[in-house]
Structures are given as C-alpha cells and as structure tokens.
Amino acid sequence: HIMPLLAAVEESEEIKGLLILLNTVGGDVEAGLGIAELIAGMKKPTVSLVLGGGHSIGVPLAVAASKSFIAPSAAMTIHPVRLNGVVIGVPQTYNYFARIQERIVSFVTGHSNVSQEMYTKLMMQTDEIANDVGSVIYGEEAVDCGLIDSIGTLSDALDYLHERMN
C-alpha cells in the first residue's frame, strides 16, 4: 500500500520532502516500476539512499529520486528480466519480456546518468554471476558508471533533502 502513501506525501502541506531508504533484493517488476514512476513524478524534493542492497527492481527505485546516494558497501544487481516456472507460448513470452526490459532500461537511463549501452552491458554480462547473466556493482562502481549520483550516508541524504526543502 505504498502508492497511496506516496500520493498522500505529495498532497500533504506538512511534509516538505521524501527520504527513500532502500535495502531490497528486488521483487515485482510492475509494482516496482509503478512506485518508481510515482517517486519520479513528485514535485517535492526526493532523495534515495541505497543501504545493503538495491537489487533488481530496486535499481529503478533508487534512480527515481531527484538525488540518489549509495553507501560505500552497498550492492546493486543488474540483470535481465527473469521468470520461473512453466512457459506456454515461448515466442510471445520472450517478446513480452523484451518489452518489459525496454521499459526498465528506458526508465533507468532516463532518470540517471548511465548510458543505455553501459546499462545493457552490465545487464547482459556473463562472467560476473555464477550460472546467471548480469552484474553486481558496489557503491563506487555505481557512481562511476553514472547509475547513482553520489556515495553517501544518511547524513548526506538528509543534508541534501533539507537544502531542497528550504
């Protein structure tokens, strides 16, 4: 029920900004993109801080804020869209996944400084994760490639937010 809460934050005259603390292994793509779109569309100042992990759909959530920070020890996993279980209609499912992946890549590259080429390269890497495709990047790497704005702590994120709220 986070979406109605984000709408309430945006409408509230008492709330001047939003701090998003992320520590997630990922989850539902549709829900994550919906939440990320809400955050990205807010007029109030927003700041995200990745702590521990901002994996999978946590990446769009992290870059949705107007400013993103990552702890030096935090990690982010970038990978293609996945599915477990029985697949009926393989070509159709593949096409559907390709379209979902395009939405994610477009959102991430549109709300960060990482290029589409770099993000796709990280997503399709085959020598990073055992028996899988993708990359795990850590604090400084996420900043160096343009995915996250800055290395930072809770104090850094709050300082940024307070500056924007005044």
Give, region by region, the residue ranges found by the protein language model.
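N-terminal organellar transit peptides
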Residues: H1-V59, V63-H79, L83-N166
